[in-house]
């Protein structure tokens, strides 16, 4: 605790921003060190690692890792998504996988908002496209727009309505304790990004497709539309479904192993 007293010398009380269109950030956390909950190992019951009997042999490990890579290298960004229904159980299992992700101090600072209501999807599309038109016209710059045009990316996002499900991933900038006080969420953005990676792998494993969308400047409006609290900030929007019959993807290649891995 002495370390935290040194780091947080200010005793001034925190205030809650009353503007619903402004996302919270770490500056909204309490500055009093005594209000920060520190979780020590002595507070968590530890048990022996329970999965020793499931560790594969080296040959099995090689096979499993190769098969997983074979599946994942087929993952592509797909912008034409079919409206064909997907069982809700599949989506729930995909989100469960994302929820197994590690997080700073086990705070699990993520919220996955799953949308299947057509009217709500339409409203989300209207918000995103309105902001995207401004992004492409003014905010992004000519070079950025040119780089995206090579991939046939525009402000139009029809997949938001056609996909049977949308998954909006929010990071919890801080937590709320039962008594209403704020709780630090360490490395919240890194934690949520790791979770998003597992989510994408789970989508691919289920045989579905998506496109990673980060709706620039639309986050606060979508948070308010979805009635999410101010301590949450939109990180990513994923339409999820089957590829449409006329779906196309850029004919791209990925960097070889020798360009992405360094062995010392």
Swiss-Prot record:
A GO CC term assigned to this protein in UniProt: plasma membrane
Q: Which CDD domains match?
A: iodotyrosine_dehalogenase (cd02144)
Q: Which UniProt keywords apply?
A: Flavoprotein, FMN, NADP, Oxidoreductase
Per UniProt, FMN binds at 75-79, 103-104, 212-214, 254
Q: Where does 3-iodo-L-tyrosine bind?
A: 105, 132, 136, 157
Tell me the classification of the organism that encodes this protein: Eukaryota, Metazoa, Cnidaria, Anthozoa, Hexacorallia
Q: What role does this protein play? A: Catalyzes the dehalogenation of halotyrosines such as 3,5-diiodo-L-tyrosine. Likely to also catalyze the dehalogenation of other halotyrosines such as 3-bromo-L-tyrosine, 3-chloro-L-tyrosine and 3-iodo-L-tyrosine.
**What family is reported?**
Belongs to the nitroreductase family.
Enzymatic reactions: 2 iodide + L-tyrosine + 2 NADP(+) = 3,5-diiodo-L-tyrosine + 2 NADPH + H(+); iodide + L-tyrosine + NADP(+) = 3-iodo-L-tyrosine + NADPH; 3-iodo-L-tyrosine + iodide + NADP(+) = 3,5-diiodo-L-tyrosine + NADPH + H(+); L-tyrosine + chloride + NADP(+) = 3-chloro-L-tyrosine + NADPH
- Key word NADP present in the record? yes
Cofactor(s) annotated in UniProt:
FMN
Which InterPro entries does the record cross-reference, listed alphabetically? Nitroreductase (IPR029479), Nitroreductase-like (IPR000415), Nitroreductase/BluB (IPR050627)
EC number, UniProt record? 1.21.1.1
Q: What is one process in the GO biological process aspect for this record?
A: tyrosine metabolic process
Originating species? Nematostella vectensis
**Gene Ontology MF annotations:** FMN binding; iodotyrosine deiodinase activity; oxidoreductase activity
Q: What is this protein called?
A: Iodotyrosine deiodinase
